[in-house]
Amino acid sequence: DINGGGATLPQKLYLTPDVLTAGFAPYIGVGSGKGKIAFLENKYNQFGTDTTKNVHWAGSDSKLTATELATYAADKEPGWGKLIQVPSVATSVAIPFRKAGANAVDLSVKELCGVFSGRIADWSGITGAGRSGPIQVVYRAESSGTTELFTRFLNAKCTTEPGTFAVTTTFANSYSLGLTPLAGAVAATGSDGVMAALNDTTVAEGRITYISPDFAAPTLAGLDDATKVARVGKGVVNGVAVEGKSPAAANVSAAISVVPLPAAADRGNPDVWVPVFGATTGGGVVAYPDSGYPILGFTNLIFSQCYANATQTGQVRDFFTKHYGTSANNDAAIEANAFVPLPSNWKAAVRASFLTASNALSIGNTNVCNGKGRPQ
């Protein structure tokens, strides 16, 4: 089997029948942090208790750091070959909540910052929400790529809060004033755990969280129900009040379509393949959009260029061929899970780099992978 796991954000997608091609074991969602460790150190026990299997790929919403890339290049690349890190799909980060009321909850960016810093501790602090009572934040307990995507946004946009947000995979470590301002904040593990805590009927209503869109609502239409999933981005433009947007895929696709490709000369560097949104631009950092839903990013795939087993090499190539294909691909499943497929120019760049046999980056290139390969 081709064994892999990691981020829970795309877990439902990768468990959708026929998304993973023949030879792939079922995806195991444990969080991006454990997924990266599992791949980088070939530690299958990050997925559970089994220590006898090898790890062949990972899913992560958290981009590999410079240190992670350098360590792998020094310790593993000489025997196993280069790693490949590419975006899989684009995603919003949704803000679902449990607080009954007839009004739509539409957060300005400043209000969103206030809720997650603890500055706004009562629902009455959100204008137009028509609700009152304590706000209780639910956050991911473990190292989470969804948390990284969310804290990137908070870091870029929440510049007038009493404290500052750092970009991190661990929410409890993000805000400079700690969790103390978030009275009664609740830690939960995994996307399933977060939604279970959010919807816990044994406690008073009032909880709010951040999560991927496939978990935020039971249906695609549910993402547009602002009595359960907040709109984000209300404000005043040229003296006219404007509503925020829902986290539905249609509201992030325009921003994704204009993200620039990595330069052809740089495509051997795994770092350049994953654009991130941030406060500053350049060096792979893209400005947050001025329109549409504002909290967005990518979930990524981490594979090896070389596998010791020829059958596994072919199976990985088959998956790339389908996932990044022009037709008979995974786009319908991606959209059904509330994500956005990569634009056609991005798919073409992935195919040209990692599937074209003559390209030195191609998966299983016999000249490059001669004597190298990730263990079977």
From Swiss-Prot:
Its main location: secreted. It is found in: Secreted. Found in human plasma. Disulfide bonds join 113-158, 306-369. GO terms for biological process: phosphate ion transport. Keywords: Disulfide bond, Phosphate transport, Secreted, Transport. One of its GO terms (cellular component) is extracellular region. InterPro entries: PBP_domain, Phosphate-bind_PstS. The keyword Kinase does not apply. Belongs to the PstS family. Heterooligomer with human PON1. Phosphate-binding protein. This is Phosphate-binding protein. It comes from Unknown prokaryotic organism.
